[in-house]
């Protein structure tokens, strides 16, 4: 099986997962929307969630969306500057257009195969800067670890500030005990840790023998470069600036969700805490293995908006407005721009060097 065919197959699988979840969410919301129409005495022939969603999208305030896109660019500029700070201890003074462009291309790649962006990002920076892929990947892992910690802080804040609404909503809408029993009874939860621990133990016991093989040497080189990249955080020049960029990144993410409230009439009265809650739930939805969080993002954003009495149909429209403007438009548009732009920039630089 060729690499191209494998990549196409993976892309189709992940898009299939995303569309399946999105269809499930849409189907359930359509049923709920029809029930609402019957209660209001509206003819079911004029009760299409699809038509409502298109009408909501066309009536959205794109002035607010433009500000959201600006916040998106600011967050990624800070991410690129923070990445430069991680690359510098490796002896690399990376150019901003290379790190920024690699990040935008990585977001675009994530729309095809989830989490492939991290690999693409390390490949792109190693192509345009003098750094090994393994070391670049190590810095990206550090970058993502910091993101996970930041998300955990955001989750903690949302839970504390919205505990009352969350608690009431889950009591009324979900049987948590039954859900937990189903999750805990899933066999893979027991099998996966056993396999993982066994693999670690056997690798540790046979490490010296493994290093004597060609495969072992290759693995050691990868792990060593990976480790150097991760450890670069302890040699960051200015920790205060590094933390500042981390705060900017996640503040912009939050602000993007909050400002989208004002682009859509049914959510325009929601406050800062609601923005944090919806942002956190949406972030968890994007983690799901589907392109850009397709389907899972819509479901979790809908659940979060339910805390604040936003109906399912309106919640679905809001999720689509955010998903299309950020996850699709921004990631595709800016990703394609830098796919075209970076080779042109470096071709010009090569010609200038040759001319001199």
Which residues does each PLM region occupy?
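Membrane-interface alpha-helices at helix entry/exit sites of multi-pass transporters
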Residues: 96-101, 116-118, 131-148, 310-321
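Hydrophobic alpha-helical transmembrane segments of multipass integral membrane proteins
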Residues: 66-74, 101, 105, 109, ...
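Alpha-helical transmembrane segments and their lipid-water interface positions
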Residues: 79, 83, 110-121, 147-158, ...
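Re-entrant/interfacial helical elements at transmembrane boundaries that shape
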Residues: 118-127, 291-307, 336
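Transmembrane alpha-helix termini and helix-breaking/packing motifs in multi-pass membrane transporters
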Residues: 154-173
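Short intracellular "coupling" helices and adjacent cytoplasmic loop segments at the cytosolic face
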Residues: 91-94, 104-119, 230
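Transmembrane alpha-helix interface/packing and boundary motifs in multi-pass membrane proteins
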Residues: 105-114, 277-298
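Predominantly cytoplasmic-facing regulatory/coupling regions of multi-pass membrane proteins
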Residues: 1-102, 169-283, 325-356
């Amino acid at each position: 099986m060729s690499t191209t065919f494998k990549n196409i197959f993976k892309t189709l699988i992940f898009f299939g997962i995303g569309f399946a979840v999105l269809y499930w969410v849409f189907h359930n919301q359509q049923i709920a929307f029809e029930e609402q129409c019957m209660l209001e005495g509206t003819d079911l022939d004029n009760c299409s969630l699809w038509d409502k969603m298109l009408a909501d999208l066309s009536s959205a305030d794109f002035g607010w969306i433009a500000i959201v896109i600006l916040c998106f660019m600011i967050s990624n500029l800070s991410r690129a500057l923070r990445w430069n700070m991680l690359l510098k201890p490796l002896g690399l003074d990376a150019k901003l257009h290379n790190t920024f462009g690699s990040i935008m291309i990585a977001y675009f790649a994530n729309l095809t195969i989830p989490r492939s962006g991290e690999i693409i990002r390390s490949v792109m920076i190693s192509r345009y800067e003098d750094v090994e892929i393994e070391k670049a990947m190590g810095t990206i892992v550090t970058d993502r670890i910091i993101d996970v910690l930041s998300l955990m802080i955001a989750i903690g804040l949302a839970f504390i500030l919205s505990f009352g609404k969350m608690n009431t909503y889950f009591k009324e809408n979900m049987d948590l005990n039954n859900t937990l029993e189903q999750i805990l009874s899933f066999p893979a939860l027991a099998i996966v840790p056993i396999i993982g621990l066994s693999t670690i133990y056997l690798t540790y016991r046979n490490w010296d023998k493994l290093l004597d093989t060609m495969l072992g040497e290759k693995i050691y080189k990868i792990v060593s470069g990976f480790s150097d990249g991760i450890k670069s955080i302890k040699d960051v020049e200015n920790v205060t600036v590094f933390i500042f960029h981390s705060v900017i990144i996640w503040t912009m993410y939050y602000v993007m969700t909050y400002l989208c409230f004002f682009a859509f009439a049914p959510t325009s009265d929601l406050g800062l805490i609601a923005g944090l809650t919806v942002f956190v739930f949406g972030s968890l939805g994007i983690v799901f293995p589907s392109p850009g969080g397709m389907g899972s993002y819509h479901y979790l954003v809908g659940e979060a908006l339910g805390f604040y009495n936003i109906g399912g149909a309106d919640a679905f429209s809001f999720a689509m407005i955010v998903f299309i403007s950020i996850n699709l438009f921004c990631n595709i548009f800016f990703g394609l721009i830098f796919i075209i732009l970076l080779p042109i920039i470096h071709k010009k630089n090569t010609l200038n060097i040759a001319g001199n």
